[in-house]
């Protein structure tokens, strides 16, 4: 009996360890080789056909912004590849007639991998697929960093008043990039508080939101981040109460 119990415990621990390894392995960045060379080569051809006239054959930018270098990376880093892919798929090429023949989603995906290659991110063994876009984060060559100034972010903290009419989030979490349309999720309700503080601007941009009704509540704030020493702030696009108690 004891041998059976020990064997069962060993199998359980092995399963848990494997599951944890799979979970950690699913969190990737573009530094991990998330596309293949063959995929990027296809993307080169599609890019030349659909994008080169505006963005330049070397992604240097002509009538449209460059798709390589620090300016491009700063705009998108610390976010998943999904929003970048959707931006390209839904809006590019700019000015394309509505009745034009649709560009296959796979071509857009290959173009994205070519952009990654030109920006210096190494290829791997497997192709990038659409179901992986939400699990791969675009980062600079120095790895994960705090989100940049101007990014649309989400943070969780306690709503407090300061001065006569100012409002802020105290004990706030480190901001993370988020699409503007995302709403609160059960996981955000359970988010542990942090140590940061952000002033809140443009409260009037949030429909039907009265800050005095949510004082000392645990809130999720979304908006555009301004990095400024001792005066970091978020220009709000959304506010949502997560818990009436901020503990």
Q: What label would you give each PLM region?
A:
Residues 1-4:
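Positively charged n-region of N-terminal signal peptides that target proteins for export
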Residues 6-17:
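Bacterial N-terminal signal peptides
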Residues 21-46, 140-149:
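Electrostatic cytochrome c docking/interface patches
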Residues 28, 64-72, 128-134:
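Short linear capping/connector segments at secondary-structure termini
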Residues 33-40, 58-89, 170-192:
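Gly/Gly-Pro-rich "capping" loops immediately C-terminal to redox-active cysteine motifs
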Residues 43-57, 111, 115:
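The canonical Cys-X-X-Cys-His
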Residues 62, 68-123:
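Extracytoplasmic electron-transfer domains, predominantly the class I c-type cytochrome c fold
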Residues 108, 112, 128-247:
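Conserved RNA-binding domains used in RNP assembly and mRNA/RNA metabolism
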